Amino acid sequence: VNWGYGGLSEFTYYRTYSRKKSDGTLETWADCVIRVIEGFFSILKTHSISSYITWDEKRAHKLAEEAAERLFEFKWMPPGRGLWMMGTPFIWDKGGAALNNCAFVSTIDIDAEMSKSFAFLMDMSMVGVGVGFDTKGAGKIASIEPEGSPELLIIEDSREGWVEALSCLIDSYLD
């Protein structure tokens, strides 16, 4: 593979985008290209079929081969997040949020939604998405000291578990 920018490019690829295979080795550039293209076209096929758009398997296969060849030769590149996550089980199991670079959440309805904005911010941050927000909800809520006995909360050690824990904590000070 002609990395184009010397050893630093290859180092960056293996450090950032190459995924560990089932045998414990890291993906080669060819492995990554196949994963990314198969991932992209599987999402495209699922979307097309669920949206009642005609799916031509033969045409898609030809396009996938052309895209893979061009990607392998660095004639085009997906976003870095596409190299990192496309074609992984994470996208099918957890959704495509990790393919996004940035997101936005409004606080305008914070008095009705309480912890929802904060939970979204944490959830997206935990998959590497930068999250912007406004201050339209400023002054709409006030924190209170929780009353009664502390409640034991068992936190699943997962992204979803920690997001739920944050929501419970924030809500305990806003109810």
Residue ranges with predicted function:
Residues 1-175:
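Extended catalytic cores of very large enzyme megasubunits
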